UniProtKB/Swiss-Prot annotation:
Belongs to the UPF0220 family. The chain crosses the membrane at residues 23-43, 54-74, 101-121, 136-156. This is UPF0220 protein C8D2.02c. The keyword Transcription does not apply. InterPro entries: UPF0220 (IPR007919). It is found in: Membrane. The keyword Transmembrane applies. It is a multi-pass membrane protein. Pfam families: UPF0220. Its main location: membrane.
Length: 170
């Protein structure tokens, strides 16, 4: 059975050049930094005298922090631990635990995105804010979308098989 027959998807990511993998990691970093910048910019905008009647509070930070925690969890899991088929140091219970932790990470990412929409609707749209105040609420949504793009790009590039990749362990 070849690698293409045993994979879930029919496209081969291993045919991409090593520089494509580096570009994917850089792209994920750019998306992550942009997400942080968009939200922190909105928080600083609301902290000063520019937004007199509306400020970004801890409620606005909760979806942001959930997404960051989700990215850390998702990208901290060793991808080889997800399949119970490997023979090195894994068993079915370890694969099950890794899948559960991966699910928690993706649930935190999705919860952060859903929470940002909820905060935007309840705090900004229902209250009737408009203009730049509405942009402060949409900054949370934009940053969480950028977090999702970053996590997806890093997950895909982390799963690329590289013919010249050696894993040396003692």
């Amino acid at each position: 059975m070849t690698l293409l027959d045993s994979s879930i998807f029919r496209f081969r990511l291993s045919s991409l050049h090593v520089s494509s993998r580096s570009l994917g990691v850089y792209f994920a970093g750019i998306m992550f930094a942009s997400a942080v910048w968009v939200f922190v910019d909105a928080a600083l905008y609301s902290a000063f005298d520019y937004a007199r009647n509306l400020h970004i509070t801890f409620i606005d930070w909760i979806p942001f922090l959930c997404s960051i925690l989700g990215i850390v969890i998702v990208n901290s899991i060793d991808k080889s631990r997800l399949s119970g088929d490997s023979f090195a140091y894994t068993d079915e219970s370890l694969a099950r635990k890794a899948r559960f932790i991966l699910f928690i990470g993706f649930a935190l990412l999705a919860g952060g995105l859903g929470g940002s929409f909820t905060v935007f609707i309840l705090k900004y749209v229902v209250a009737g804010y408009e203009g730049k105040s509405l942009l402060m609420g949409s900054a949370n949504i934009i940053s969480n979308i950028l977090f999702m793009i970053s996590a997806t790009a890093l997950w895909i590039t982390g799963n690329m098989n590289d013919d010249y990749h050696y894993n040396l362990q003692l």
